[in-house]
């Protein structure tokens, strides 16, 4: 067993060896290294064909038309292109956007930028289980609302939004609907034919593909128009200029094909491991799950261990590669904004750890993790005066702390 044990699959996944092998065939002189936009020779034609195959594979994953797939540098760029693209194209129809407080920073900061440009954004608060009720979204809709952006699976707590229901609502009100599916594409079934979603952001490195490549699904019927944010040679039907990175795209295509083929078996195995982990730690006193356990992705588990400081717990769990919050904001010492939006106080938010399980996690690793967590929590609470006071029945909320 290799240490530290990787339990941070929501931050990134290792490239599947089958994907890496396909990518290697698109790099060197004896491979498919040409520019897909070179139409005058075989090297370009071969690269274009490889890109077309990958585009089909990504489209098949979500049951889309290959012409609806726009390759980008990742889900962050896809989010930017979708939200800014819609806002700038449809601004004469209205300048109101609806999103949630628990979105990824790629959505929140894009909306903040649009606010600086004169758009108005409503940030919806979730219920304590992390989910946003349909009525809340409907109540926020106005005559001038042009876009709703709600994520499919939350990156920190793993809760799954009912995308089909939100899509129905948006379509009935003629409002464009964007979904950040970075955490769900390749892990949960997505069918754009039955879901009334207009734009979907996808990342390759969350589904065992390479970093630096993603896609944006842009619906053709009814047709969604976007204003480009990247200008140049007019690649990707004018929506995203820049030479297509054949090896990255081929990697994403192969990752999508494997994810589609293995989704059911992968998820069954991952769910068993997730349940094993939770059953192994839920007996620890004052341990709470964050987010709706039933309506969440099976590879994600966000747990608060009360009376234990998150940073010291992570240091104690040095044999486990886990995170407190998302990788994109883990450099800050602020408690997770997602957990704060759920109504957790600073202490509980700070004592939370995100465990995310994936394709290469083993039962042996989970058992080692359970043992390590139980021991570490015990050791840290031994040193905690707050834990001692709690054990003695002191109501810590009523304690008047002296200021020095």
From Swiss-Prot:
Subunit structure: Homodimer. Forms a heterotetramer with IscU, interacts with other sulfur acceptors.
MF term (GO), any: pyridoxal phosphate binding
Sections of the chain in a coiled coil: none
Binding-site positions, pyridoxal 5'-phosphate: 75-76, 155, 183, 203-205, 243
Protein name: Cysteine desulfurase IscS
Recorded metabolic or biological pathway in which this protein acts: Cofactor biosynthesis; iron-sulfur cluster biosynthesis
Top-level EC class as recorded in UniProt: transferase
